[in-house]
Swiss-Prot record:
Region (Disordered), start-end ranges: 155-196
The UniProt record lists the keyword Ribosomal protein: yes
GO MF term set: RNA binding; structural constituent of ribosome
InterPro entries listed in its UniProt record: Rbsml_eL15_core_dom_sf (IPR024794), Ribosomal_eL15 (IPR000439), Ribosomal_eL15_arc (IPR020926), Ribosomal_uL23/eL15/eS24_sf (IPR012678)
GO biological process assignments: cytoplasmic translation
Coiled coil: none
Cellular component per GO, a single term: cytosolic large ribosomal subunit
Protein name as it appears in the record: Large ribosomal subunit protein eL15
């Protein structure tokens, strides 16, 4: 069976440092570091990933690149007396992932658009870069698209901010169902944040 062009792109991005992608990284990151936090781009860097997540080259859809700082929350160790068990240094799980932060920033930059999905495109020692697919729910070409018309409904307003994207649901523990997820539904907050 003949491999598609998208499969070759996907294979190259699996191990960027061992393929031609790694050679492009150095030049790209130098340019990206000079850019603002959120910037609109002409076309996706990873076309295979963008297409898999719902991107189409048509009116009403744009792609933006956003960068966010790397690492977890820097929490200093207490200098006052208490049990090390109660310092809260090891078992803290952050409420929002880096990817979700990037989606929210892009959503605020383009208030007339809704976040469809996002994917990783690069990182260095300080930042991670994500590309976010945004859709205009009021555009006629989106309303008439059988795959994207669902986003025109009012229930999807503010998807990124409410954690309804794929990255948002992952952070809220709602990618799984059944045994072990009892504290994740209807939400983590409803169970006093014991679900994560």
């Amino acid at each position: 069976m003949v491999k598609s062009a998208y499969s070759y792109i996907r294979d190259a991005w699996k191990n960027p440092s061992k393929t031609y992608v790694g050679e492009l990284f150095w030049e790209r990151l130098q340019e990206w570091r000079k850019e603002p936090t959120v910037v609109k781009i002409d076309r996706p860097t990873r076309l295979d990933r963008a297409r898999a997540l719902g991107y189409k080259a048509k009116q009403g859809i744009i792609v933006a690149r956003a960068h966010v700082r790397r690492g977890g929350r820097r929490k200093s160790r207490y200098s006052r007396g208490r049990k090390s068990k109660h310092m809260g240094l090891r078992t803290l799980t952050r409420r929002t992932s880096i990817q979700r932060m990037a989606e929210v920033r892009a959503s605020r930059k383009f208030p007339n658009m809704e976040v469809l999905n996002s994917y990783w495109v690069g990182q260095d020692g300080k930042h991670k870069w994500y590309e976010i697919i945004l859709v205009d729910p009021h555009h006629p070409s989106i309303a008439s698209d059988k795959n994207l018309s669902w986003i025109t409904k009012g229930t999807h307003r503010g998807r990124a901010e409410r954690g309804l994207t794929s990255a948002g649901k992952k952070g809220r523990g709602q990618r799984r169902k059944g045994k072990g997820t009892e504290k994740n539904y209807p939400s983590v907050q409803a169970h006093d944040r014991r679900g994560k």
